[in-house]
C-alpha cells in the first residue's frame, strides 16, 4: 500500500509538471494572440486618424458609436515624462478622465513617450476605466496624414472580460482534468493490475486528443462550405475523373513501391542477420542511409542525374535511347530507394529474434537449405513482412515531396491534396482528398490483421540459441551480396551527387569549385538546426517507450475497444502530412487546447506521426515471444512494470532500437506536416533545405542535407552505446 501511495504521489508530481507546462503554453499563446489582435486593431484605427480638429472630433464620435470592442481618447499635446497634461483629452469621457488623472504615472509617461516616437505601447498592467472592469491600455501616435507630424497621442482601452473568461475556463478545465485524472489514477493504482489500466487510460486519452479530435476537425471542414453543412466538396471529388484518376494512381504507386521496397528490405535484412556475408557494417549503413536524409534529396539527385538535362540522360541520348525519369517508373524507383529502409529496419529485428533451433532441426532431418528457408524461416518472418509492406504502402500513399518533383503525367492524391491546400487555398478539398487516402490504408490494415491472426509465430521460448544457422550456399550468398552491392553503388552515386553539390558554386549553371556554400549554409541554419535536434531528441524516447507499451497491450491483453485503439494508433501513418498539419492547426488554435506556435505541437506531431512504426515492430516481435516467460515472472512476484522492464523490453530490443532510430531520423527529416506547424520561434532544418531547393540554391541545400545526415549517423552511434546488447540474444553465424 505504501509503495502504491508513493508511486501515486510521484505520478501526480510528474502530471503536475507536465500539466503546468501545457497550461503555461496554452495561456501564453492565447494571451500572445489576443494582444497581437488588439495591437493590429490599434494600428488599423490609428492609421485612419484625420486632419483638423472638427474632423478629429467627428472621427472620435464615429468610433464610439461603431465599436464596442474598445474605447478611444485623444491627447492633443503629448506631455513630458512625469508631467501632467496641458490640454484636456477628447473622446470617451471615462477613458479621458483616467488619462488625465494618470498622465504623470510611469506607465502613462512611457506610453506617451512611445507615441511621440511613433511607436505603439501596451501598459504592463490593466487599468480600471470608470466603473467598468479592468481594461488593457494601448498608446499610439496620432499622425497627421498631410504633414506626417505627430499631433498627439491616441489612448485605447480594450475590455479584458474575454481574456479573464478564458482564463477562468482554462483554470476550471485544467483543475477539473487534474482532479478527474487523480481519481482515475488512484482507482487504477489501487486495482489488481493498476499499471495496465493506467497505460490503457493514457493511450485512449492520447489517441482521442491527438488523433480522433484533429481528424474530426478536418472531416468537419470537408463538409463545410461558406460555414454551412454541405456535401458539395465530396460530390465534386467523387464525380471528378481527375480526382478518381489520382486515387488509382496512388494505389498503383503504393503497391509497386511497397512490393519492391519490402523485397529489397528483406534482402538487406536477411543478408545482414542470417548470413556470413562480408561488409555487413557497410550494408547496414547503406540500408538506413536513405531514410535519414531529407525526403526530397534523393529526388533531386535523380533529377540531376536522370532528368531531362541530367548527366546520364545526355549519355543515353547519344546512343539513341529516349529515356524519361518522370512518371510512375521514376516515382517507384525513387520511393523504393527512399523507403526500403523502413522494411529493412522492421525485418532486421524480426529475423534476429527467430530461434535458429527450428532451422537446425530441419537441416538435421535432411531438409535442404532452400526447403528450410521456405518452410521455417520465411513463414516465421511473415508478421514482419506484412508489417513492412503495410508501413511502406501507407508511406508511399502519404508522400507528396517525391511526386511534387517527379510525378509527370501521373496524378496521385497526396499531390492533389497538397496543391489544393497550398496552391488553390481550398482547405476543405485538401482535407477531403487526404481523408480519401484512409480507405486503402484501412483495407490493408484489416487484411494484415486477419491473415496474421490465423497463424502462430512463437519462436522465442526463454531458451534462445546462441547462434544462427547459415541457410545459403556460398554461391547463393555471393549472388545475394552482388545484388546488394549494385543497390549500394547506386545509393553511393546518388549521395555522391549531394556531396558534390556542396562544393559546386551553382549546380546546373556554374560548376566552379567553391567553399562559399558551406560558410553561408552553416551561418544561416544555426537556429533551425538547434531547434530540429532539440525537438527530435525530446520526441524520440517518448515515442519509443509508448510504442512498446502499446504493442504489449495489443498483443498480450484483452480489453474492450482493443480494435478501436489499434486503429487509432495506426491511423496517423496513413495520413498525408498536409492533412495532419491542417488537422492540428484546425484543432489546436483555439480553446480549450491552444498549441499552435509552440514546441509542444511539433513534438506531439512527431510522436503521433511515427508511433505506428514502433508499434508494428513491437507487435511483430512480441508475436514471436512465448507468453509463458512473462507469466513465469509474474508468478514469481514481479509486477507489470518489472516484467516490462526486465523481460519484455530486452526481448524486443531490436524492435525497440528500430523504433527509437526511426522516430529520431523521421523527426529530423520531416517536412510535410511540420511545414504547417513551424513558427518564428521554432523552425525546422528540412523546411530550410526545401526553401533553398525551391529557390535553386542547390549548393546550400546539399550542405544542409550532408550536415543532417552526419548528425543522424552520430545519433545512431550514441543510441547503440546507450542501449547495450542483450547477451542472451547475441548470435554468431556458424
Where are the model-predicted features located?
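Membrane-proximal extracytoplasmic alpha-helices
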Residues: 21-55, 59-66, 158
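Short N-terminal helix-loop-first-beta-strand/juxtamembrane motif that initiates sensory/input modules
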Residues: 60-88, 177
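Extreme N-terminal signal-anchor transmembrane helix of membrane signaling/transducer proteins, especially
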Residues: 1-25, 175-177, 182-186
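Extracytoplasmic/periplasmic sensor domains and loops in membrane signaling proteins
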Residues: 57, 85-133
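Membrane-water interface segments at the C-terminal ends of transmembrane alpha-helices
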Residues: 195-227, 240-352, 380-400, 432-449, ...
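Glycine-rich helix-loop "coupling/hinge" segments at transmembrane-helix boundaries
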Residues: 304, 399-425, 510, 671-698, ...
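A short, hydrophobic, proline-anchored segment that marks a local hinge/packing element in signaling
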Residues: 136-148, 290, 572
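Helix-start (N-cap) segments at beta->loop->alpha junctions
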Residues: 155-172
Amino acid at each position: 500500500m505504501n509503495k502504491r501511495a508513493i508511486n501515486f504521489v510521484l505520478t501526480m508530481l510528474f502530471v503536475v509538471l507536465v500539466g503546468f507546462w501545457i497550461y503555461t503554453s496554452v495561456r501564453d499563446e492565447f494571451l500572445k494572440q489576443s494582444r497581437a489582435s488588439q495591437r493590429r486593431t490599434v494600428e488599423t484605427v490609428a492609421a485612419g486618424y484625420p486632419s483638423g480638429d472638427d474632423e478629429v472630433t467627428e472621427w472620435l464620435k464615429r468610433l464610439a458609436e461603431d465599436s464596442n470592442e474598445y474605447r478611444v481618447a485623444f491627447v492633443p499635446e503629448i506631455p513630458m515624462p512625469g508631467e501632467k497634461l496641458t490640454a484636456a483629452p477628447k473622446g470617451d469621457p471615462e477613458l479621458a478622465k483616467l488619462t488625465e488623472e494618470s498622465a504623470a504615472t510611469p506607465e502613462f509617461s512611457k506610453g506617451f513617450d512611445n507615441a511621440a516616437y511613433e511607436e505603439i505601447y501596451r501598459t504592463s498592467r490593466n487599468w480600471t476605466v470608470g466603473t467598468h472592469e479592468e481594461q488593457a491600455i494601448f498608446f499610439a501616435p496620432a499622425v497627421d496624414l498631410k504633414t506626417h507630424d505627430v499631433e498627439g497621442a491616441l489612448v485605447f482601452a480594450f475590455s479584458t472580460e474575454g481574456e479573464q473568461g478564458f482564463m477562468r475556463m482554462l483554470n476550471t478545465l485544467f483543475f477539473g482534468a487534474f482532479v478527474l485524472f487523480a481519481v482515475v489514477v488512484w482507482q487504477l493504482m489501487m486495482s489488481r493490475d493498476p499499471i495496465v489500466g493506467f497505460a490503457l487510460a493514457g493511450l485512449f486519452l492520447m489517441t482521442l486528443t491527438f488523433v480522433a479530435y484533429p481528424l474530426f476537425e478536418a472531416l468537419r471542414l470537408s463538409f463545410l462550405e461558406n460555414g454551412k453543412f454541405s456535401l458539395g466538396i465530396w460530390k465534386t471529388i467523387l464525380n471528378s475523373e481527375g480526382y478518381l484518376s489520382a486515387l488509382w494512381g496512388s494505389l498503383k504507386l503504393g503497391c509497386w513501391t511497397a512490393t519492391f521496397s519490402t523485397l529489397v528490405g528483406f534482402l538487406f535484412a536477411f543478408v545482414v542477420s542470417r548470413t556470413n556475408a562480408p561488409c555487413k557494417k557497410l550494408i547496414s549503413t547503406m540500408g538506413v542511409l536513405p531514410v535519414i536524409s531529407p525526403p526530397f534529396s534523393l529526388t533531386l539527385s535523380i533529377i540531376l542525374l536522370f532528368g531531362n538535362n541530367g548527366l546520364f540522360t545526355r549519355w543515353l541520348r547519344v546512343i539513341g535511347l529516349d529515356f524519361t525519369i518522370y512518371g510512375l517508373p521514376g516515382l517507384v524507383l525513387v520511393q523504393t530507394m527512399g523507403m526500403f529502409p523502413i522494411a529493412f529496419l522492421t525485418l532486421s529485428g524480426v529475423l534476429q529474434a527467430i530461434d535458429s533451433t527450428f532451422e537446425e532441426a530441419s537441416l538435421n532431418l535432411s531438409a535442404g537449405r532452400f526447403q528450410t528457408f521456405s518452410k521455417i524461416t520465411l513463414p516465421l518472418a511473415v508478421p514482419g513482412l506484412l508489417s513492412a509492406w503495410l508501413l511502406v504502402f501507407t508511406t508511399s500513399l502519404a508522400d507528396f515531396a517525391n511526386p511534387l518533383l517527379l510525378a509527370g503525367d501521373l496524378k496521385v492524391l497526396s499531390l492533389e491534396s497538397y496543391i489544393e491546400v497550398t496552391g488553390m487555398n481550398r482547405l476543405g478539398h485538401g482535407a477531403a482528398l487526404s481523408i480519401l487516402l484512409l480507405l486503402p490504408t484501412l483495407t490493408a490494415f484489416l487484411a494484415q490483421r486477419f491473415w496474421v491472426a490465423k497463424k502462430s509465430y512463437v519462436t522465442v521460448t526463454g531458451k534462445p540459441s546462441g547462434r544462427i544457422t547459415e541457410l545459403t550456399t556460398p554461391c547463393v550468398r555471393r549472388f545475394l551480396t552482388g545484388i546488394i552491392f549494385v543497390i549500394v553503388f547506386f545509393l553511393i552515386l546518388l549521395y555522391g551527387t549531394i556531396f558534390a553539390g556542396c562544393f559546386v558554386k551553382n549546380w546546373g549553371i556554374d560548376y566552379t569549385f567553391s567553399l562559399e556554400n558551406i560558410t553561408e549554409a552553416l551561418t544561416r541554419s544555426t537556429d533551425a538546426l538547434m531547434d530540429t535536434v532539440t525537438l527530435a531528441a525530446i520526441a524520440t524516447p517518448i515515442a519509443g517507450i509508448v510504442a512498446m507499451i502499446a504493442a504489449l497491450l495489443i498483443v498480450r491483453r484483452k480489453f474492450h475497444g482493443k480494435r478501436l485503439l489499434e486503429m487509432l494508433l495506426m491511423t496517423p501513418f496513413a495520413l498525408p502530412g498536409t492533412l495532419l498539419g491542417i488537422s492540428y492547426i484546425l484543432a489546436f488554435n483555439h480553446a480549450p487546447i491552444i498549441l499552435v506556435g509552440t514546441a509542444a505541437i511539433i513534438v506531439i506531431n512527431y510522436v503521433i506521426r511515427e508511433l505506428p512504426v514502433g508499434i508494428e515492430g513491437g507487435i511483430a516481435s512480441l508475436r514471436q515471444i512465448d507468453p509463458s516467460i512473462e507469466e513465469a515472472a509474474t508468478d514469481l512476484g514481479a509486477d507489470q512494470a518489472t516484467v516490462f522492464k526486465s523481460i519484455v523490453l530486452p526481448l524486443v530490443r531490436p524492435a525497440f532500437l528500430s523504433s527509437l532510430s526511426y522516430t529520431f531520423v523521421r523527426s529530423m527529416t520531416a517536412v510535410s506536416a511540420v511545414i504547417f506547424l513551424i513558427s518564428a520561434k521554432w523552425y525546422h532544418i528540412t523546411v530550410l533545405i526545401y526553401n533553398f531547393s525551391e529557390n535553386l540554391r542547390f549548393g546550400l541545400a546539399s550542405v544542409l542535407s550532408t550536415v543532417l545526415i552526419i548528425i543522424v549517423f552520430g545519433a545512431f552511434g550514441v543510441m547503440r552505446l546507450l542501449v547495450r546488447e542483450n547477451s542472451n540474444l547475441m548470435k554468431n553465424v556458424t
